[in-house]
Amino acid sequence: VIATSFTGCFGRKKSGEAFSMPIMDEPTSLDPQIADSNSEKLVAANCYEGLVRIMADGTIGKGVATDWNISDDGLTYTFKLRNNSHWAMFSGHKAVLGENYEDTFDITVKAEDFKFGIERTLSEQTGSADAPLFSAVKSISTPDDFTIVFNLSYADDNFLYALTNPGAMPCDEEFFNLTNGK
């Protein structure tokens, strides 16, 4: 909870100003789906934006999701995403994505990226510490680029809070595969 609180506290960044925060140990991975230590979770919370976030008062607020609906029985969660969220891309990506990656690689964060991220979290092969948080998830669908629907096998009052954890962060499948998951 502390890590996600820091992400919104510094809205008046001046040009050339850096934000630094001491962490207990050096993260061994920047992959949010396998973030395990407090340091890794702290880094993930400050590098990725989820569907929702925990606000200063402890309530759930908007992240990439602009709106969401929960069915009366608590088994279906539907999120609408904003269409102007983008992956940060740097010139170093040319080695992996090609010289003209800006023209060939879609940097828009889409519903499918959240679906793939949570599916990775749930995969035994990933071994994510966050997997138990999503045990209620029966299926995930993306009816369009900016809508994601979670169908749960049982009502989970903590599901929105689970979505604030690193295991729920987006992961672009094309980029993941091109980099062999690194």
Task: Please report, for each region that a protein language model flagged, where it lies by residue.
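Short, low-complexity disordered leader/linker segments with a strong preference
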Residues: 1-19, 29-32, 59, 99-103, ...
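Extracytoplasmic
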Residues: 16-18, 46, 63-65, 72-76, ...
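Surface-exposed binding/hinge segments that line
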Residues: 113-115, 120, 126-179
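Solvent-exposed coil/turn segments that connect beta secondary-structure elements
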Residues: 24-27, 35, 56-57, 73-74, ...
